[in-house]
Amino acid sequence: FIGDIWSGIQG
């Protein structure tokens, strides 16, 4: 989920 909330978790 790049560019979403998960962007920080996903990388």
From Swiss-Prot:
Localization per record: Secreted
Gene Ontology CC terms: extracellular region
Keywords in alphabetical order: Secreted
Main localization category: secreted
Tissues with expression: Expressed by the venom gland.
Transmembrane segments: none
SS bond partners: none
Record-given protein name: Venom peptide 5
Source species of the chain: Brotheas amazonicus
